Amino acid sequence: MIEGVRDIEESTLRTVQGLLRTLMEKGVVNALLVPMTLPSDSVAPMLVTDAAALEQADPLAPVLPINGARAASQLTMTSHKEKLGMVLRSCEIRALVELVKFQQVKLDNALIIGIDCLGTYPVTGWQAAGSKQQVVDGLLVGAVTGELQPFDGMEFRAACQMCEQPLPEGDHVALTIGLVGVETGQVYLKARDDVAQALGLTANGTPAARAAAAETLISARSQARDAAFAEYRERVHSMDSLLQEFSTCIRCHNCMTNCPICYCRECIFRTPTFEHESQLFYQWAERKGTVRMLPDTLLFHLTRLNHMVTSCVGCGMCTDVCPVDISVGTVFRAVGERAQVLFDYHPGRSLEEAAPVQEFREDE
């Protein structure tokens, strides 16, 4: 890997767009998965094959409408001749790594481009933001020291407030675009040799302030995480309190649908198993006196926890899409933390490290 800084030309966004355009023009990739600004002024991940269209690319936009690993799965799971570059945040990369292990993503003809995440806002909050450029500029200023604060009147997504892994990590990342701990007017790049050569990157090292700024950011996020987990564990400590936590669940399955790890088409909740015959409801009511409609809400969440909590990367998409504002992501992260410690497993850390559900250990 080659590391160095590059002076910004015109703006940080234009510089990043230029880097991506160079990768396409030099043939390192001939397609890109990248967030782009839409005519509605919202942002969505787009598949780009025309380098000129990168004028609308906006990987700096602090919004995460979906976890990009879901899109990457659709673009790579079956054979394709195009060389694909995927511009992703850290939580998306970690989800991608997990999906590689479950054979839902293939990296044979793809490379990962990671960008420092300075925090994201809910989709509706970003859409309603007045001066989007001021919001982004404020984050870039805070990134220099790692002291990131939301824009006045706005609030980071709950998952971002307690994300202790905001920077891309791992040798599987072919290009890192660094913003944290980088002087105003520069951008930090860490690239695989062939990518560095295409970009004309000179090896001049890591910015001196990057490690300290990253530590400042991670420390603040870790404190917020620990406080959120402590509050959850104080509130949920028994079966009754767990039932209360999910008492407003309407079993819409939004959390499952938008979770990058819940890919399984054979999931029991996608089958007729829980499409009970009408008479059964009356029999249950006769036995219990009352039956909740729709039933099996807690079973749904417990099944998801059992199946994927060791691979939960904390992206928070489940919380974002819950129509009744259940903090699903906090539940899964708090439970997942203990399960992951138990198996000494860090989801998304390594492509070579098998997920706990993929292997059997006699001492587990």
Q: Where are the regions a protein language model picked out?
A:
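Generic structural signal for well-ordered, non-membrane alpha-helical segments
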Residues: 9-16, 252, 315, 328
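Short amphipathic alpha-helical segments
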Residues: 98-100, 175-176, 261, 271, ...
